[in-house]
């Protein structure tokens, strides 16, 4: 009985230590989530403005007849996917949702291998490479609040691959942050630049402007910048969803640990009560034997 009590007590202490760790990790993830939400909000100011300008320009007569490859759809022989996952686990179903969505896409549309994956995050890169899938570029070790400088190379590389016709359309697959408890898988087309919402055009417009030095050079600068801002926005959004998933996973782990501790405490008290009862019974029996 003493051994049983000691064993239960050891489990309680071990679970308490685990609870302290997961509780601390929950607080860290919550702090990261707050910073990421603010970063995403700040970036939207820039992203909204460049989208307004691009939308208004594309709706104007200034781009009629443009042969810019980022605007013109071409026969799709190969599709590129930027897939955003985390570098580490302990984020609940965050990675599994994205990986399942990608596997479903490939099974439905790319059984002949006409796809290329640009993996952001070690979990996704390892997953695809372990299955012999076509990973053409990867980025690991993304910061908690990634700067454009950190991801600029892989973004520019993705756009350049499209312009060089290594693939004929480009999508980004990521978890969109809804709130601290919810995220949604998004597969969003980046290239060619799809039809834009006319309601988002800048109020002042650009139709009355003269483009210097010329239209094609303006588009050559603006369209990559616009596409890169969309991709970077998706990365920031995905990172926010990752922190939310981590916070929720650690909160669930902490709650589960507390439930285990409560159950073990009840089990310990019952075992201790049984041991005390047995000791009393043995003492009484011994006293009776002496009479």
Curated annotation (Swiss-Prot):
> Pfam families per the record?
ATP-synt
Tell whether Transmembrane is among the UniProt keywords: no
Can you quote a single GO CC term? plasma membrane
Compartment(s) where it occurs, according to its Swiss-Prot or TrEMBL record: Cell membrane
Record GO terms (molecular function): ATP binding; proton-transporting ATP synthase activity, rotational mechanism
Keyword set includes Membrane: yes
Q: InterPro entries per the record?
A: ATP_synth_F1_ATPase_gsu (IPR035968), ATP_synth_F1_gsu (IPR000131), ATP_synth_F1_gsu_CS (IPR023632)
- How does it sit in the bilayer? Peripheral membrane protein
Which UniProt keywords are present, listed alphabetically? ATP synthesis, Cell membrane, CF(1), Hydrogen ion transport, Ion transport, Membrane, Transport
Gene3D superfamilies named among the record's database cross-references = 3.40.1380.10, ATP synthase, gamma subunit, helix hairpin domain
Q: What GO terms describe the biological role, i.e. biological process, of this protein?
A: proton motive force-driven plasma membrane ATP synthesis
Which top-level group of life is the source organism from? Answer: Bacteria
The principal location of this protein is membrane
Assembly and interaction partners = F-type ATPases have 2 components, CF(1) - the catalytic core - and CF(0) - the membrane proton channel. CF(1) has five subunits: alpha(3), beta(3), gamma(1), delta(1), epsilon(1). CF(0) has three main subunits: a, b and c.
What's this chain's function?
A: Produces ATP from ADP in the presence of a proton gradient across the membrane. The gamma chain is believed to be important in regulating ATPase activity and the flow of protons through the CF(0) complex.
The entry's family comment says: Belongs to the ATPase gamma chain family.
Protein's UniProt name: ATP synthase gamma chain
Which species does the entry assign this protein to?
Streptococcus equinus
């Amino acid at each position: 009985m003493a051994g049983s009590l000691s064993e239960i007590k050891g489990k309680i202490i071990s679970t308490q230590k685990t609870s302290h760790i997961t509780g601390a990790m929950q607080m860290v993830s919550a702090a990261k989530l707050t910073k990421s939400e603010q970063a995403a909000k700040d970036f939207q100011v820039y992203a909204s403005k460049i989208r307004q300008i691009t939308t208004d320009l594309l709706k104007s007569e200034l781009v009629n007849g443009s042969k810019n490859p980022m605007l013109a759809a071409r026969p799709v022989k190969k599709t590129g996917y930027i897939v955003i996952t985390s570098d580490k686990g302990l984020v609940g179903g965050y990675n599994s949702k994205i990986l399942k969505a990608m596997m479903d896409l490939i099974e439905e549309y790319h059984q002949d291998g006409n796809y290329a994956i640009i993996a952001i995050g070690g979990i996704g890169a390892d997953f695809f490479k372990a299955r012999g899938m076509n990973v053409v570029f990867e980025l690991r070790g993304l910061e908690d609040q990634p700067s454009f400088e950190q991801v600029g190379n892989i973004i520019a590389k993705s756009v350049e691959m499209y312009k060089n016709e290594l693939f004929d359309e480009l999508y980004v697959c990521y978890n969109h942050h809804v709130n601290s408890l919810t995220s949604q898988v998004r597969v969003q087309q980046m290239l060619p630049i799809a039809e834009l919402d006319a309601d988002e055009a800048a109020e002042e417009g650009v139709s009355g402007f003269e483009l210097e030095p010329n239209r094609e050079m303006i588009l050559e600068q603006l369209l990559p910048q616009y596409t890169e801002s969309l991709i970077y926005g998706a990365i920031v959004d995905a990172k926010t969803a990752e922190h939310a998933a981590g916070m929720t996973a650690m909160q669930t782990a902490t709650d589960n640990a507390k439930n285990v501790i409560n159950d073990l405490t009840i089990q310990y008290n019952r075992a201790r009560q049984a041991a005390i009862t047995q000791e009393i019974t043995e003492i009484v029996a011994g006293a009776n034997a002496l009479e």
